[in-house]
């Protein structure tokens, strides 16, 4: 896909950041851009190139593919073990980098970590859980669920994004999720 673009009056915060040089490069690139191309590569990875009037690439960007996770999910398996009568749910909000949900006993909230240099990468961080006491079997499932969330690093999409397998760094499945709603 190819098109034209015009960007003007660019403002940036310039708060202290490790990416400040990169932000200046992006600002300059946006100012010079007059056209763009969008390219789809393998595994549904999209790239945006902004081009100057001579056709030189001034900004090269990759769309992070974790957006497929945004929505409400039911947890069907933890570490390969089926969860019977699962009332474990997770709501993932990739644009806001937040998660929340139910463990079957407690509720939880946390943050999402993305690495723009790794395809299909996601981490769940800073997870906090309410402290209700439930029957031992529910507490064991909750504990396994929280550990699996913390081990997650890879998204594996199936069935058109209706099923997600979350894998650890060794590509072992830690969670199987089924979409409840977008």
Where in this protein do the model-derived segments appear?
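Lipid interaction determinants
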Residues: 1-182
């Amino acid at each position: 896909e190819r098109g034209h673009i015009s960007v003007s009056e660019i403002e940036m915060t310039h708060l202290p950041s490790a990416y400040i040089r990169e932000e200046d490069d992006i600002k300059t690139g946006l100012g010079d851009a007059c056209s763009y191309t969008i390219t789809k590569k393998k595994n549904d990875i999209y790239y945006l190139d902004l081009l100057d009037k001579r056709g030189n690439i001034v900004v090269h960007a990759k769309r992070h593919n974790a957006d497929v996770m945004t929505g409400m999910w039911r947890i069907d398996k933890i570490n390969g073990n089926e969860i019977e009568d699962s009332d474990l749910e997770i709501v993932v909000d990739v644009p806001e980098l937040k998660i929340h949900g139910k463990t079957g006993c407690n509720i939880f909230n946390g943050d999402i970590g993305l690495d723009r240099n790794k395809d299909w990468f996601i981490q769940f961080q800073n997870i906090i859980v309410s402290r209700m006491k439930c029957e031992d079997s529910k507490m064991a499932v909750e504990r396994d669920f929280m550990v699996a969330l913390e081990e997650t690093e890879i998204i594996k999409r199936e069935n058109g994004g209706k099923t997600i397998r979350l894998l650890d760094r060794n590509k072992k499945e830690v969670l199987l999720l089924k979409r409840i709603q977008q």
